[in-house]
Every structure is written in structure tokens, then in C-alpha cells.
């Protein structure tokens, strides 16, 4: 096996291990904690009539939840992805896969990503770093990733800070937008552009929408800090000092949502980054999101058992439904207009 492929697998293994064992959270909070719903003591709604259903990528979902992209490429990642996918299928929610670049150079990693057979009905998202378009990945190869796992969309993730704090990271980020547009025009499915924990600004969102992007995952600061993950991976003190200095970098999830409010009418917004509960998810929907994503706590559960993932998802859904009832919101559209205070 070429040395570069070995390094890719080693890096993915280290990422899982560090995320499970170390505190890699940003020192920033998501900002959602500053929002308070106005409690409705007389909601006049039957709990059984609360409707959390929605549609995403043409598929029905029982709740507006995305299992955010995490991993792939290793045996441990295969088990994690299978458990996440099975739980997503049973819960009626969406799932994103981790970066699939390794599949283009190491085809035998395919089993770590192919989960459609255990999750036939869910919105399933393929995933690759957008910067890879500057390093030889073609629109045709992006379509190959989609076809291989029977995905409903392709995530192009923007992870500039993560790449720059990796010793082996990709540093050429020029002229990327035209290449993203090429992929959008070539593919048979929609493209989702996603940050990885540092937020999307209004200016960047406008550029992406103009290029044809219909779904944005803001992935704001407040959750996992990938620069902090790289600080733990650092092989020397200099690398550690550089990476760890960015632990409070980024646009918080709430600030990113507020920036995108006036331009989000015709696109789908996924809110992720530091969300910890269905209450946080409800706040994100109130601030303009259509769907909310979580990763960290589901990763920890999926490393152990599918039943724990199912339990976490059920807790999140129940928190969402209780929040809806306590704000007098029968549907997600009602929740998006619920009274709040700061």
C-alpha cells in the first residue's frame, strides 16, 4: 500500500480515537444558550398531535435531524457507520458519511461507507472535502462516490482551518468556487456545502447560493474544534502551539444563523455545531434552520452499540416535541414562529 494511503488510514484512526477520548470542544459556545423560549402554560395542544415530520432531498423524515458526517475508511469506522445508519433508518432521520476521499485511492475501503442496504429509506449524504477539487478530484469522481453508496446528495465540506493545522493538510484554496460550480452542474444529485465547525458567513453563503448551492450546513463554532483535534495529533510542540491557538476561532452557530436569515428563503439550512439536545435543535429551527445536525454524542454511542444511538436519538426527539408543546407549536412551521426572548 502506498505510504500516502497508509497515512490517510492512520489519520482517520487518530481522529476517531481523539474525538472519543479527549476534550476537543471549542471554548466558544454555540450561542443558542442565549435564546429563551417564552413558556406557554396553556398551549391547547394534544401531545399526540405534535408533528415533527419534514421532507429533505425529496424524502420524508420523522424528525428534522441529521446525523452529521463523522468517519469512514477504517474497520472501526465501518462498525460506527453501520450502527448510525441502522439507527437513522429506524428513527426516520438523515445521515451524512465522513470524508470519502480515501475511497478514490483505496477502493477496498468501500465497505466502511456502504450503508444503504441497512438504511434504504433515509436521506444519505456522500462527502468529500471541497479543497480536493484543487488536488485532482474531478466531477466524475464525485459522481462515482454518489453512485457507489447510492447517496441522495454530495457534501462538499469547507475545512480550511482544519487543513491548515494539519502538517499534511492541503493549503491551496484559490479558484475553488468555479470548481464547486462545475460539480454542481455535473452531478445527478444536489450539492450541500458544509463548514466543519467554524461557521458560514453571509458573504460566503451568498457566493455559494449564486453558484447554485441549494443546501448549506453552517456548522458553526461551539462544538468540536478540529484545530484542537490536530493539536492532540501534533508531533512536536510547535505544531501543537499553532493548532491549539485556534480553539476559540470561528462564527458561532447562532451568529451564522442570524447572518443567513435574510438570504435563506429559497435554500435549505442545516444548523450544526455545538448542538447538544432537541431543545437546541428547536432554537435553531426558530432561528431559520430547516434541519439540525449532531455528531459528538452520537459518535460516542455508536462506538459502543446501536441501541445507545437509538436512545440518544429518541431523547433528542422527545426534547424537541416537549419544547414544541411548551411553546404552543403543533408543527415545525409553528415552531419557526414561536415567541422567544434574549
From Swiss-Prot:
Recorded family membership: Belongs to the IPP isomerase type 2 family.
Quaternary state and interactors: Homooctamer. Dimer of tetramers.
GO terms classed as biological process: isoprenoid biosynthetic process
GO MF term set: FMN binding; isopentenyl-diphosphate delta-isomerase activity; magnesium ion binding; NADPH binding; oxidoreductase activity
Keyword field: Cytoplasm, Flavoprotein, FMN, Isomerase, Isoprene biosynthesis, Magnesium, Metal-binding, NADP
Enzyme class: isomerase
Functional summary from the UniProt entry: Involved in the biosynthesis of isoprenoids. Catalyzes the 1,3-allylic rearrangement of the homoallylic substrate isopentenyl (IPP) to its allylic isomer, dimethylallyl diphosphate (DMAPP).
Isomerase found in the keyword field: yes
Compartment annotation: Cytoplasm
Binding-site residues for Mg(2+), renumbered to this chain: 163
Presence of the UniProt keyword Metal-binding in the record: yes
Main location (coarse class): cytoplasm
Name by which UniProt lists this protein: Isopentenyl-diphosphate delta-isomerase
Pfam family membership, one: FMN_dh
Binding annotation for substrate: 11-12, 99-101
InterPro entries: Aldolase_TIM, FMN-dep_DH, IPdP_isomerase
Amino acid at each position: 500500500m502506498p505510504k500516502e494511503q497508509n497515512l490517510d488510514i492512520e489519520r482517520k484512526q487518530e481522529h476517531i480515537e481523539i474525538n472519543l477520548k479527549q476534550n476537543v470542544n471549542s471554548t466558544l459556545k454555540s450561542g443558542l444558550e442565549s435564546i429563551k423560549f417564552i413558556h406557554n402554560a396553556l398551549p391547547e395542544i394534544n401531545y399526540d398531535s405534535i408533528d415533527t415530520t419534514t421532507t429533505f432531498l425529496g424524502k420524508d423524515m420523522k424528525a428534522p435531524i441529521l446525523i452529521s458526517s463523522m468517519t469512514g475508511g477504517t474497520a472501526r469506522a465501518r462498525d460506527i457507520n453501520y450502527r448510525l445508519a441502522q439507527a437513522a433508518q429506524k428513527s426516520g432521520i438523515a445521515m451524512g458519511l465522513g470524508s470519502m476521499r480515501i475511497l478514490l485511492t483505496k477502493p477496498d475501503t468501500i465497505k466502511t461507507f456502504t450503508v444503504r442496504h441497512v438504511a434504504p429509506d433515509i436521506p444519505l449524504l456522500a462527502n468529500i472535502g471541497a479543497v480536493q477539487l484543487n488536488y485532482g478530484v474531478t466531477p466524475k469522481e464525485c459522481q462515482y462516490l454518489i453512485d457507489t453508496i447510492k447517496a441522495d446528495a454530495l457534501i462538499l465540506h469547507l475545512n480550511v482551518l482544519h487543513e491548515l493545522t494539519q502538517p499534511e493538510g492541503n493549503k491551496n484554496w484559490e479558484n475553488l468556487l468555479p470548481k464547486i460550480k462545475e460539480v454542481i452542474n455535473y452531478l445527478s444529485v444536489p450539492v450541500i456545502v458544509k463548514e466543519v465547525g467554524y461557521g458560514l458567513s453571509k458573504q460566503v453563503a451568498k457566493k455559494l447560493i449564486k453558484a447554485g448551492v441549494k443546501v448549506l450546513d453552517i456548522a458553526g463554532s461551539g462544538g468540536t474544534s478540529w484545530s484542537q483535534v490536530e493539536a492532540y495529533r501534533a508531533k512536536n510542540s510547535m505544531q501543537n502551539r499553532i493548532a491549539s491557538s485556534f480553539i476559540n476561532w470561528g462564527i458561532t452557530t447562532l451568529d451564522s444563523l442570524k447572518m443567513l436569515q435574510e438570504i435563506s428563503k429559497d435554500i435549505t439550512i442545516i444548523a450544526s455545531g455545538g448542538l447538544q439536545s432537541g431543545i437546541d435543535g428547536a432554537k435553531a429551527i426558530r432561528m431559520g434552520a430547516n434541519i439540525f445536525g449532531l455528531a459528538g454524542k452520537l459518535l460516542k454511542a455508536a462506538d459502543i452499540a446501536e441501541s445507545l444511538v437509538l436512545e440518544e436519538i429518541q431523547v433528542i426527539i422527545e426534547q424537541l416535541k416537549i419544547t414544541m408543546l411548551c411553546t404552543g407549536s403543533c408543527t415545525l412551521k409553528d415552531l419557526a414562529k414561536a415567541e422567544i426572548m434574549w
